[in-house]
Every structure is written in C-alpha cells, then in structure tokens.
Amino acid sequence: MATIKDVARLAGVSTTTVSHVINKTRFVAEATQEKVMKAVDELNYAPSAVARSLKCNSTRTIGMLVTQSTNLFFSEVIDGVESYCYRQGYTLILCNTGGIYEKQRDYIRMLAEKRVDGILVMCSDLTEELKEMLDRHSDIPKVVMDWGPESSRADKIIDNSEEGGYLATKYLIDNGHTDIACLSGHFEKLACQERIAGFRRAMAEAKLPINEDWILEGNFECDTAVLVADKITAMEKRPTAVFCFNDTMALGLMSRLQQNGIKVPDDVSVIGYDNIELAEYFSPPLTTIHQPKRRVGKNAFEILLERIKDKEHEKRVFEMQPEIVIRNTVKKLN
C-alpha cells in the first residue's frame, strides 16, 4: 500500500506539498498539482482517514439510527440524508435498530467508538431508554427526527401531526363524509396521539359524533391493515371513510378491502399520511398528507452540521408543515 512518502518521491516534491495538494489547504502551482495527482493515480494512493481524523479531530462520518430502513417513509428520508452527506464529503453509517434496546445500545456505543462527528436519530421505540443512552454521550452532536425521543441536548425536526390529522379529517368532512374511522399506529406514540387530536378537532368543529370503536390501533405495517380491512368488511354499519396514519397501512387496507369486494373509493374512501413514492402509482392513486421526506433528511443533515460547528448553541425545534395531496381515493358524497 502506497504512502504519502511514496507519492512525494515519485512526484519529486515534499510530503508537505503532497498534503497541501490533497487537502487543498494552501496554494500550490498548477504544474506541481498535476505532478502530485499523476503520482497519486499511478500509485493508487488513498490518504489515511484515521491519520486525518487524528489531526483534524473530525472523521467526516455521520451515524444514523433508524427503526427500520425498509419502511418506505424511513427509506425516503434516509435517501435525502445520504444524498446530502455525499455532496458534503461525509460518510453515513446506517444503523437499523429494529426498535431493540440492545441494538440501540450497541450501535450508539459503536458510533461513539468510531468518533462520528454527529448522530441523526429516527427511531420510534423505547423512547425513554434511548433518550438516556443519547444523553450519556452529550459530547456528540445530535439531531432527532420525526418520532424520536425528546432529548435535552439534541435539536429536533418534527412533523406537525396534529395539523396533519386535522387536514385529513377536514378534507373527508368537506367531501360529505360523517362516518369516519381512524387506523392509527401504536396509541402510545406521540405522533399517533397528535393525529388523533387533529381528527377530534376537525370532527368537533363540524359538530360530528365520533364512534370510539372506529379508532383502531395498528402498527404502521400492512399486516394490521389487513386485519382492520377484514374487520370493516364484517361490520353491519361501515364507515364511509378511513383515515390511515401512514401510507403503508392505507395501501394494505385498500388492497384487502378490494380483495373482499369493497371498492375504493366507491364503497369506502381512504386517505393516507406521508405521501410515499408508491402512493401515486397505486390503483387507485392514494389521496394523502404530504411530508417532505427528502427535505427532512436535508434539513436534518444541515442542522447537524451547524451543531457540529457550534456545540454550545441552545436546543432548537424545527416544525415541518403538512400538506394534502389530492388523488383518487376519496369519494365526494355531497
């Protein structure tokens, strides 16, 4: 493996000059730069990231904790983070925790050992334990995204879930729906509580009664949506519309309802949440609440860079505003 001394010897310059050319830390004549880069190419020389990190006190590496990167919402946010990391010359270490305490603990320890410059957190489970683990590493800059735990030492980007729940429900009401069901994620999740609060606000504003039996608990995955679809199919009196708290459940619900002979939106209307890429291409295309996922990823990375540069500034909370995307899964009844 070639060293910086080998490059300097082949180029006929000092190791200091090679360092300045590679790191762009000082003006070097163009002819000299060309000689150095030619030697770098011939020797297939790669600078030592370890040595550079020791000298600069920076590894240019970011860690990211996610519950499940295969989740379509998470994957689009991750894509945004990775894209901006690459553009800024940072490496992203992605850690799938599966919501498992031991994996969260071990990954945080590993990221600390690797001296990452900062950590992005997008986990939805074991919030108190995760908060405590993150707070133990107070020297590492952090940004918590979406469902993550509140931390006294981390900036946070959140979705205005209460407003999103309100917008989805109001759109159904504006289209003549009064018998509305909700398919939530786990009830203990803050985002779910806020979306239910938005649902209740819209129903109260329209002076409509709420059937508490129609506020149904899922897990943000298709399997519970299938069970709920079967439950709705068996109901003597069905809701005319279902507000699903993410698009994955909405698509699973629609698929199963249609398998059961219930047409969407002719028999039951469906509205989702997230606006994942697949929502536009499903049949029928899903009406949903849009979350700017790639922008969330970009903003999270930019905020983390600011925190890395200034570790002492006060904790900040950034709120992303939801928008409705109208497609073809809500029937107009009025």
UniProtKB/Swiss-Prot annotation:
At which residues is the DNA-binding region annotated? Answer: 4-23, 48-56
Q: Which residues bind hypoxanthine?
A: F73, K189, F220, D274
Q: Which Gene3D superfamilies match?
A: 3.40.50.2300, lambda repressor-like DNA-binding domains (1.10.260.40)
Give the pathway listed in the UniProt entry for this protein. Answer: Purine metabolism; purine nucleotide biosynthesis [regulation]
Residue span, HTH lacI-type domain: 2-56
Q: Which InterPro entries match?
A: HTH_LacI, LacI/GalR-like_sensor, Lambda_DNA-bd_dom_sf, Peripla_BP_I, Tscrpt_reg_HTH_PurR
Offer an example of a GO molecular function term for this protein. transcription cis-regulatory region binding
The superkingdom of the source organism is Bacteria
Record-linked Pfam families: LacI, Peripla_BP_3
Q: Which terms does the UniProt entry file under GO BP?
A: negative regulation of DNA-templated transcription; purine nucleotide biosynthetic process
User: Which controlled-vocabulary keywords does the entry list?
Assistant: DNA-binding, Purine biosynthesis, Repressor, Transcription, Transcription regulation
- PANTHER family given for it? HTH-TYPE TRANSCRIPTIONAL REPRESSOR PURR-RELATED, LACI-RELATED TRANSCRIPTIONAL REPRESSOR
Task of the protein:
Is the main repressor of the genes involved in the de novo synthesis of purine nucleotides, regulating purB, purC, purEK, purF, purHD, purL, purMN and guaBA expression. PurR is allosterically activated to bind its cognate DNA by binding the purine corepressors, hypoxanthine or guanine, thereby effecting transcription repression.
Please describe the quaternary structure of this protein: Homodimer.
> Could you give the domain comment from the record?
Consists of two structural and functional domains: an N-terminal DNA-binding domain, approximately the first 60 residues, and a larger C-terminal domain, approximately 280 residues, which imparts the function of corepressor binding and oligomerization.
Would you tell me the protein name for this molecule?
HTH-type transcriptional repressor PurR
Output the lineage of the source organism: Bacteria, Pseudomonadati, Pseudomonadota, Gammaproteobacteria, Vibrionales
